[in-house]
Curated annotation (Swiss-Prot):
Protein name (database record): Early glycoprotein GP48
Transmembrane residue ranges: none
Main location: virion
Localization per record: Virion membrane
UniProt-annotated glycosylation sites, renumbered to this chain: N22, N44, N49, N57, N65, N104, N108, N118, N135, N144
Highest taxon in the source lineage: Viruses
Entry keyword annotation includes Transferase: no
UniProt topology in membrane: Peripheral membrane protein
Similarity comment text for this entry: Belongs to the RL11 family.
UniProt keyword list: Early protein, Glycoprotein, Membrane, Signal, Virion
Mod. after translation: N-glycosylated and possibly O-glycosylated.
Signal peptide from the UniProt entry: 1-21
UniProt organism field: Human cytomegalovirus (strain Towne)
């Protein structure tokens, strides 16, 4: 029964995308990387769904990055930066990054993951992982968190 429902969702999403070229149906549970031609979060991006409990933790895994990529974890579609990582310089093994103060958010981040700590219901929202490669091409992955 679940397999039939999943197949129906996939077919519906494909039809919706083919006819309207923009859909908001989520059919995946794993994050997918979306290439952005205009450096903006793609309008048809599909978010991976995550759930957490109040007081718990959740970890988002970033996708496909290299040491020469510029990486950022973002809070919501307003592009509020949580932390950013800069390309490593040749011969320098130190990680170059900035960590930003975000109200009502306790977290740890590395170049490939973001862990939210001591979750509250205020943490329910979309989070984005942005990667800019050496050719200045932007890629995004989306994580939709629901805390209950």
């Amino acid at each position: 029964m679940m397999l039939r429902a999943w197949r129906l969702m996939v077919l519906l999403a494909a039809y919706c995308y083919y006819v309207f070229a923009n859909c908001s149906i989520s059919t995946t549970t794993a994050p997918v990387e979306w290439k952005s031609p205009n450096r903006q979060i793609p309008k048809n991006i599909t978010c991976a769904n995550y759930s957490g409990t109040v007081g718990g933790n959740v970890t988002f895994q970033g996708l496909k990055n290299k040491t020469e990529d510029f990486l950022s974890w973002l809070l919501g579609s307003g592009y509020k930066s949580i932390c950013s990582f800069f390309p490593q310089l040749p011969g320098d093994s130190n990680e170059q990054h900035y960590r930003y103060e975000v109200t009502n958010l306790t977290y740890n981040c590395t170049y490939d993951r973001l862990t939210l700590l001591n979750l509250t219901t205020e943490n329910s929202r979309n989070y984005y992982f942005r990667r800019e490669d050496a050719n200045s091409t932007f890629y995004y992955s989306c994580y939709n968190l629901t805390v209950s």
